[in-house]
């Protein structure tokens, strides 16, 4: 199924680029899947989910070589890429350009180190994770209550 997915994605990107050469593609997955039958696989290798940004004008070294983050950081990254310089935006988490800290449902990354959240010692980071989750859940449940002030 990996060959098929790669083939279909490649055909889609070629067709979209032919239609609009300025298209920006962000491709990621929703879970880690590795076909490695060794027990000597690191948590980083076992848990990593690929994400790439591709399009005209997007350099191959857009992110630091050791950049890591979460899906919640894709939207602010897009904002930084496409908004006019000096334009501001609000986000729960920083963009992938600031990838010192990230988390998912059970893991955290801090300064290039990955671990189980239950083992995280940094109380400030734990509080940030809990706050971001609380706000995200509230927005999912009550998002329609948010109104623009004009």
Regions found by a protein language model. Give the residues of each.
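Catalytic-adjacent loop/helix segments of enzymes that bind and process anionic phosphate/sulfate esters
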Residues: 1-8, 14, 46-49, 61, ...
